[in-house]
Design a protein with these regions (language model features):
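Conserved acidic segment of CheY-like receiver
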Residues: 4-16, 20-24, 53
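Short amphipathic alpha-helix used as the core "switch/output" element in two-component signaling
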Residues: 43, 65-76
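Active-site residues of response regulator receiver
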Residues: 56-57, 84, 106
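Alpha4 helix (beta4-alpha4-beta5 surface) of REC/receiver domains from two-component response regulators
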Residues: 66, 87-102
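C-terminal output helix
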Residues: 90, 108-117
Length: 150
């Protein structure tokens, strides 16, 4: 059974995708699939649910931020590292709000990306918070409101 982590690499540049895929797979730690545009990212995430998405912010079709908005609607979307040759404070803030784990400005060293990828998989899983309904029900019970009144 293959124990490698699955990575979806999304970038508009075929040359960049190819070179980065080769460097990442060379480690033997990751299996890499590629996407050329935002719509393909959404399709592949839905079909394969990768462990990690490494995505450029500037994609054809849907840009990276729009893809992140769509992925946020899913329950178990992949962890995400966002890359871009263009950096703005607004984009960084929005990416952070949408749950991006890391932002890497281009150009970057492949080893830097690999360090970030490895670090994400070594972190302890985040504690999941109870749903709003569960929390409201708990509070209602604590204050003694009958269960049929909500």
């Amino acid at each position: 059974m293959d124990q490698r982590r699955t990575v979806l690499l999304a970038d508009a540049s075929e040359e960049f995708r190819s070179l980065l895929r080769e460097e990442i797979e060379k480690t033997g730690e990751f299996s890499v699939d590629i996407a050329r545009d935002g719509n393909e990212v959404l399709k592949k995430v839905e079909e394969r649910t990768p462990d990690l998405l490494v995505m450029d912010a500037m994609l054809a079709g849907l840009d990276g931020i729009s893809v992140l908005r769509q992925l946020q609607k899913q329950e178990n979307g992949p962890m995400t590292i966002l890359t871009s040759g263009f950096v703005s404070g607004r984009m960084l803030m929005e990416a952070s709000e949408l749950g991006v784990a890391y932002f890497l400005p281009k150009p970057f060293e492949t080893e830097n990306l690999l360090d970030k990828m490895r670090g994400l998989f070594l972190q302890a899983p985040k504690e999941t918070l109870p749903s709003l309904k569960t929390r409201v029900t708990s509070v209602i019970h604590e204050i003694g409101v009958p269960a049929h009144i909500k």
